[in-house]
Amino acid sequence: MKVLVNNHLVEREDATVDIEDRGYQFGDGVYEVVRLYNGKFFTYNEHIDRLYASAAKIDLVIPYSKEELRELLEKLVAENNINTGNVYLQVTRGVQNPRNHVIPDDFPLEGVLTAAAREVPRNERQFVEGGTAITEEDVRWLRCDIKSLNLLGNILAKNKAHQQNALEAILHRGEQVTECSASNVSIIKDGVLWTHAADNLILNGITRQVIIDVAKKNGIPVKEADFTLTDLREADEVFISSTTIEITPITHIDGVQVADGKRGPITAQLHQYFVEEITRACGELVFAK
């Protein structure tokens, strides 16, 4: 397996990171995950635009143009012969010796790019049968719109869900539902798609954006606004979405069944529209059972 370290492809076992790298010591960096279908990137530009936007919000300079970055990632995918999978890439602020919280202004740090590509099949069974979720207080920082390497709050929530045999943790600040530990959450109520507004309390998921777009194109009303735990529990349908899980229904929350406990009709419609978008961009799909 080859991975990318700056502009070099190296064997996985030969890849190293400096112990004084600010990403390693502070989580000072940003990242993205881009999906591949049939060896082709899906919503690549949207992901990379978000990467550069996140970097700009923390005054981090990515040392490659968007065109140079795409060329590097395409080489990474080709070298590893990825058909259906994910590319994980991150950029840290770089090496600072000695370690200091303050970003130096007397010399520029050189950002460090790393990336890896892996084959990850689609999970059609999960898309249909769904999964369960727990609810958990959202204790993360207040700039969740930045796709930062700082993920400890997400990790703790996700691990708590795992310990309870749940797929996800749905996060809330008081009564207000925000998102999940590793995905966005949406509900369907009286035929309306309802999802949290794209503000600083959530990451504006690329899959979320595609879902909103196809919903509007197909006449499904969309409401981008806060909703409560009560709204969540009384919803007709609940689903989570992300680059890796596409659109996955939630059948139970905190052990309580959502509606009839099955994927709802609008969730199914939205996933079909989503698959059509993938097919247009990347070709016909093969489902993993």
Curated annotation (Swiss-Prot):
Cofactor needs: pyridoxal 5'-phosphate
Catalytic activity, as annotated: D-alanine + 2-oxoglutarate = D-glutamate + pyruvate
GO molecular function: D-alanine-2-oxoglutarate aminotransferase activity; pyridoxal phosphate binding
Keywords: Aminotransferase, Pyridoxal phosphate, Transferase
SUPFAM superfamilies in UniProt: D-aminoacid aminotransferase-like PLP-dependent enzymes
Residues modified to N6-(pyridoxal phosphate)lysine: 147
Residues annotated as binding substrate: 31, 99, 101
One BP annotation, GO: D-amino acid biosynthetic process
InterPro entries cross-referenced by the UniProt entry: Aminotrans_IV (IPR001544), Aminotransferase-like (IPR036038), BCAT-like_C (IPR043132), BCAT-like_N (IPR043131), Class-IV_PLP-Dep_Aminotrnsfr (IPR050571), D_amino_transT (IPR005784)
This protein's GO CC annotations: cytosol
Disulphide connectivity of cysteines: none
Residue sites binding pyridoxal 5'-phosphate per the record: 50, 179
EC number(s) from the headed UniProt entry: 2.6.1.21
Top-rank taxon, per record: Bacteria
Function: Acts on the D-isomers of alanine, leucine, aspartate, glutamate, aminobutyrate, norvaline and asparagine. The enzyme transfers an amino group from a substrate D-amino acid to the pyridoxal phosphate cofactor to form pyridoxamine and an alpha-keto acid in the first half-reaction. The second half-reaction is the reverse of the first, transferring the amino group from the pyridoxamine to a second alpha-keto acid to form the product D-amino acid via a ping-pong mechanism. This is an important process in the formation of D-alanine and D-glutamate, which are essential bacterial cell wall components.
Quaternary state and interactors: Homodimer.
PANTHER family: AMINO-ACID AMINOTRANSFERASE, D-ALANINE AMINOTRANSFERASE
UniProt family annotation: Belongs to the class-IV pyridoxal-phosphate-dependent aminotransferase family.
Stated name of the protein: D-alanine aminotransferase
Originating gene: dat
